[in-house]
Amino acid sequence: MIQPQTLLNVADNSGARELMCIRILGASNRRYANIGDVIVAVIKEAVPNMPLERSEVIRAVIVRTRKELKRENGMRIRYDDNAAVVIDQEGNPKGTRVFGAIARELRELNFTKIVSLAPEVL
């Protein structure tokens, strides 16, 4: 469950290290975002000499949350951190690598490029 003002780690090599959620895209008054939701975020920490800089507003898709994700078969999956992948306007990742495991639900939400870059899909 990600809400505005939540800090997230960045799970790719786009140049950003930490994001802060400022808006959840979708309905006009969504309170929380889960895995697979697109958010508007601001970069709080960035790697020097990279295209993305601090205080830049970007879009990202959430790939891991500490709040457990309940699947239809009854299984619950929980990760150690809140993480997102930086995307462009078309939904393609800005980085060329994705770090850490991501949820299988991203494939059903048409983020297949992110799923193909991930080392592990749970």
UniProtKB/Swiss-Prot annotation:
Show the PROSITE patterns listed in the entry.
RIBOSOMAL_L14
GO MF terms, alphabetically ordered = large ribosomal subunit rRNA binding; structural constituent of ribosome
Subunit note: Part of the 50S ribosomal subunit.
Main role?
Binds to 23S rRNA.
Instruction: Give a GO cellular-component term.
Output: cytosolic large ribosomal subunit
Task: Respond yes or no to whether keyword Ribosomal protein is given for this record.
Answer: yes
**Compartment list:** Plastid, Chloroplast
The yes or no answer to whether the keyword Transcription is present is no
Name of the protein this chain belongs to = Large ribosomal subunit protein uL14c
Which domain of life, per UniProt? Eukaryota
Where does the UniProt entry say this protein principally localizes?
A: plastid
Annotated source species: Lemna minor (Common duckweed)
- Write out the GO biological process terms: translation
Sorted keywords for this record are: Chloroplast, Plastid, Ribonucleoprotein, Ribosomal protein, RNA-binding, rRNA-binding
Against InterPro entries, the record matches this protein to: Ribosomal_uL14, Ribosomal_uL14_bac-type, Ribosomal_uL14_CS, Ribosomal_uL14_sf
Looking up PANTHER family in the UniProt record yields: 50S/60S RIBOSOMAL PROTEIN L14/L23 (PTHR11761), LARGE RIBOSOMAL SUBUNIT PROTEIN UL14M (PTHR11761:SF3)
**Which Pfam families does the entry mention?**
Ribosomal_L14
Q: Which Gene3D superfamilies match?
A: Ribosomal protein L14
Per the record, the gene is: rpl14
| Family from the record | Belongs to the universal ribosomal protein uL14 family.
